[in-house]
Amino acid sequence: MAKVDLFNIKGENIGTVELKEEVFAIEPNQDVMWRYIDMQLTNSRAGTASTKTRGEVSGGGRKPWIQKHTGRARQGSIRAPHWRHGGVAHGPKPRVYFKRLNKKMKRLALKSALSLRLKENNLVVVDDIKFEKPRTKDLREVLKNLGLENQKVLIVLPKKESEYENVKISGRNIPGVKVLIADNPGVDRVNIDGLNVYDILNHDKLVLLQGTVQKIEEVLG
């Protein structure tokens, strides 16, 4: 079992926490993490970009000028791609961007990302963070106590409930800070609010609550 220090919201070391090695201490697989992120970013694309071809823009029904004897280059339509206001050649059209990754690879990618953060000493475990009401100042104070001020920090909460929801709202207005819920880790599907590889690797520090660690080990262990 891997061990890490346990802190409270005042930044005080109050003990240690044992982490499952099969979840937090495996050899990170760079290839699988890349595949997961590629899938996640691809599936987040709207696919709504659209342009008109020469057959879809208005006008251009007749030949601009006769073929010969003008001294100018021959032209067939004022809506050809090389004309101003003409159609677009090989432009984007609405399409579905979708990639799959099997559940085994998703699990491995998440465990690799978590293990990488622990290996780099960028994983912080806090006993609990709960606010009676949303307040940005309170969360800033917690981050300051933990020595995480002015850093890109990902905070993962164990579940959706009002006191944790207040923490999530409190983090909205702090640059570089993102708060997710571990209730829906991106194993069965990539959830915007759930724990995922991209957000883990896109932030310098990963903050987990004790309840979050239990939830992650329950799903990935």
UniProtKB/Swiss-Prot annotation:
InterPro entries, per the entry: Ribosomal_uL4, Ribosomal_uL4-like, Ribosomal_uL4_dom_sf
Chain positions covered by the region annotation Disordered: 47-77
SUPFAM superfamilies: Ribosomal protein L4
Cystine pairs: none
Signal peptide positions (record): none
Single GO term (MF): rRNA binding
One Pfam family, short name: Ribosomal_L4
Record carries keyword Ribonucleoprotein: yes
Keyword entries, A-Z: Ribonucleoprotein, Ribosomal protein, RNA-binding, rRNA-binding
GO cellular component: ribonucleoprotein complex; ribosome
GO biological process, one term: translation
Quaternary organization: Part of the 50S ribosomal subunit.
Known function: One of the primary rRNA binding proteins, this protein initially binds near the 5'-end of the 23S rRNA. It is important during the early stages of 50S assembly. It makes multiple contacts with different domains of the 23S rRNA in the assembled 50S subunit and ribosome. Forms part of the polypeptide exit tunnel.
Protein name per the record: Large ribosomal subunit protein uL4
Source species of the chain: Thermosipho melanesiensis (strain DSM 12029 / CIP 104789 / BI429)
Gene that encodes it: rplD
